[in-house]
Amino acid sequence: MKRIKQFLMIIALFILPALVFATTGAEIMQRVQDTQKADSSAMDIRLGLIESNGEVRERRIQTLTLTENGLTNTITVFLSPASVKNTRFLTRQRSDGTDDQWIYLPALSRVKRIAASEGSGSFMGSDFSYSDMASTTYDTDEANHTLMREETVNNRNAYVIESIPITASDYGKTVIWVDKETYLPLKVDFYEKDLSTVLKRLITDEIAFTEGRWITKSITMTTLATNHSTRIEIVQAKYNIPMNSGYFTTSFLETGRVL
């Protein structure tokens, strides 16, 4: 009997760690969120609109983010070309988990609020919608996340997570391939509401280690029906830097000045 007990204890030593440290979809997505957290950031970005024939139209933008009291605000400013220069886009997160969004269009010289019904519309001709710009795909309280399997993406080991939104969403679900080493998304499929068709696919083209953290340096979003793509490349990024909250106001949105 004593030997049997010893044997069972040895077996338990192998089994219990696996049970205690079992990985769930929610735990993985929480790691994804934690990996990407920063009190503030400033990014210079090269954005390319890629037609199905390969023609590319380039934009240069700057994006600032500031998180205060757990709420993240983002301002995006278009720097070039001249046709979109000084276009500014503001997203402010609310305590109820929703977002307020405004856009300033220089040609109209006014600020326009983005209604919830406009969330699925294209952001500045890109393959990202207004809702994508305030995406809660990775939020553990905005979707149910299930670990489906593990597989390899571009020679990197990944968790495959199915995320079904709890609240209103433009998508029926997303499937996310999360890098097991860096916890960065390597690939995301965005599905129709009936779950039968992949509408858009996001691919991480390059990851990099900068400012003491892993980041997605280049990503491409493709609308599968049209084969139109949008590539976003981070030229420079700084994190946890002093940031004036005046940038995240409708006053700055309209004037381009911090009052």
Question: Where would I find each of the regions flagged by the language model?
Answer:
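Gly/Pro-enriched, hydrophobic low-complexity segments
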Residues: 79, 90-92, 100-104, 110-114, ...
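Gram-negative outer-membrane assembly/targeting C-terminal domains
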Residues: 32, 242-259
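Sec/Tat signal peptide C-region and signal peptidase I cleavage site
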Residues: 16-22
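N-terminal mature ectodomain segment of secretory-pathway/periplasmic proteins
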Residues: 23-107, 146
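Short amphipathic beta-strand and strand-loop transition segments with alternating hydrophobic
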Residues: 64-65, 146-152, 205-207
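A short, amphipathic edge element
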Residues: 26, 57-58, 135-146, 199-201
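Bacterial N-terminal signal peptides that target proteins for export
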Residues: 1-11
